[in-house]
């Protein structure tokens, strides 16, 4: 279920403030965030945001096509290793 249109899009206020600081200083720096539920705003275009996937921070470069989507959509949390079977044992083992 999507968010009510009368509420408007959600974005973590600290993340948005850091993005606006970088825009004022004309800087490009990787920002780490745990806020996967934040909506991507036009001010974020051109920045790299490292989104936490539960284990590590995945760097996501923000483009114009991503505006309106959530940050978590671009940092998958699950890794599919294949279904069971003889072949899967050889391929699916982590090194």
Curated annotation (Swiss-Prot):
Q: Where is the signal peptide?
A: none
Q: Does the keyword Cytoplasm apply?
A: no
Compositional bias annotation for Basic residues: 80-95
InterPro entries documented for this protein: Ribosomal_uS19, Ribosomal_uS19_bac-type, Ribosomal_uS19_CS, Ribosomal_uS19_SF
User: Keywords of this protein's UniProt record, alphabetized?
Assistant: Ribonucleoprotein, Ribosomal protein, RNA-binding, rRNA-binding
What processes in GO biological process is this protein linked to? ribosomal small subunit assembly; translation
Record's GO cellular component terms:
cytoplasm; small ribosomal subunit
Q: Which domain of life is it from?
A: Bacteria
Region Disordered, residue ranges: 75-95
Provide a Gene Ontology MF annotation, just one: structural constituent of ribosome
Chain segments annotated as coiled-coil in the UniProt record: none
Tell me its family.
Belongs to the universal ribosomal protein uS19 family.
- Its biological purpose: Protein S19 forms a complex with S13 that binds strongly to the 16S ribosomal RNA.
**UniProt name for this protein:** Small ribosomal subunit protein uS19
Q: Supply the gene name.
A: rpsS
């Amino acid at each position: 279920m999507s968010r009510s249109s009368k509420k408007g899009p959600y974005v973590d206020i600290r993340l948005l403030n850091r993005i606006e600081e970088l825009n004022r200083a004309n800087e490009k720096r990787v920002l780490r965030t745990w806020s996967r539920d934040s909506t991507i705003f036009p001010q974020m275009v051109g920045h790299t945001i490292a989104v936490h996937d539960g284990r590590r921070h995945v760097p996501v470069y923000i483009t114009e096509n991503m505006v309106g989507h959530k940050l978590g959509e671009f940092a998958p949390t699950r890794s599919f290793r294949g279904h069971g079977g003889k072949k899967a044992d050889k391929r699916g083992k982590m090194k």
